[in-house]
């Protein structure tokens, strides 16, 4: 990766654990940050409401981060849910499909997100885009794969005649390693902020608090987050 300390990045920021960690990662590396979130009719749209508290928390965590935070953007793309019969956009039970993918997979979601992000970045004069896609701890989503992101980077750069760079700092990290990255970036305060204020639960449940944060505790997203937290805590206790 080229030296980015005098550059601006656009971060895909949903209000979840991964995107918040990526935002902190970007704040640690770029001179200025803008964020973009998407309202596509997701059941867990409560994550969008978490963003303001997370941004305030990040700004208070480090004064230099506060000075780097720029404009925040939210795009509404309801057509994505209109063409997607998935458990993230419909009130149906979460289960595995015949194709081996869970029905939480929204076809083309990350492709659409990154394309809209690149279009906005183009208009804002930004060439660096940061996303929380991960191939290690994921549900088999094909649009989270490293080869997908690299192919899309090439397509976006060609299609807009601008050399975009898509950064995916979590691509090869387990969920436990993602918690550790948060600690490395901002210490216990950042870990606590992400645990208490970010949202991951697919069902949008924010009533029950667990040691790893809020959620139903049963959906795949909660299970992954919980297992990662417990592995992280176990590793921290041994070090």
From Swiss-Prot:
Q: What's a single GO MF annotation on this record?
A: ligase activity, forming carbon-nitrogen bonds
Name the catalysed reactions.
7-carboxy-7-deazaguanine + NH4(+) + ATP = 7-cyano-7-deazaguanine + ADP + phosphate + H2O + H(+)
Q: Which residues bind ATP?
A: 13-23
Q: Which cofactor does it need?
A: Zn(2+)
- Cofactor binding summary note: Binds 1 zinc ion per subunit.
Pfam families named among the record's database cross-references? QueC (PF06508)
Q: Which HAMAP family match?
A: QueC (MF_01633)
Q: What does this protein do?
A: Catalyzes the ATP-dependent conversion of 7-carboxy-7-deazaguanine (CDG) to 7-cyano-7-deazaguanine (preQ(0)).
Protein name (database record): 7-cyano-7-deazaguanine synthase
């Amino acid at each position: 990766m080229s030296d980015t300390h005098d550059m601006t990045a656009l971060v895909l920021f949903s209000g979840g654990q991964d995107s918040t960690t990526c935002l902190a990662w970007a704040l640690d590396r770029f001179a200025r940050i803008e964020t973009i979130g998407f309202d596509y009719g997701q059941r867990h749209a409560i994550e969008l409401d978490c963003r303001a508290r997370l941004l305030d928390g990040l700004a208070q965590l480090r004064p230099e981060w506060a000075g780097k935070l720029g404009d925040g953007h939210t795009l509404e793309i309801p057509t994505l849910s209109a063409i997607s019969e998935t458990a993230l956009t419909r009130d149906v039970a979460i289960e595995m499909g015949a194709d081996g993918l869970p029905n939480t997979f929204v076809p083309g979601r990350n492709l659409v997100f990154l394309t809209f992000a690149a279009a906005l970045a183009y208009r804002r004069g930004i060439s660096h885009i940061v996303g929380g896609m991960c191939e290690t701890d994921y549900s088999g989503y094909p649009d989270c794969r490293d080869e997908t992101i690299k192919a899309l980077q090439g397509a976006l750069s060609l299609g807009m005649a601008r050399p975009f760079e898509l950064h995916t700092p979590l691509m090869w990290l387990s969920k436990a390693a993602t918690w550790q990255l948060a600690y490395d970036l901002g210490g216990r305060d950042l870990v606590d902020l992400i645990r208490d204020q970010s949202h991951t639960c697919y069902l949008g449940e924010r009533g029950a608090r667990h040691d790893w944060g809020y959620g139903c505790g049963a959906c795949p997203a909660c299970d992954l987050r919980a297992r990662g937290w417990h592995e992280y805590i176990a590793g921290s206790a041994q070090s």
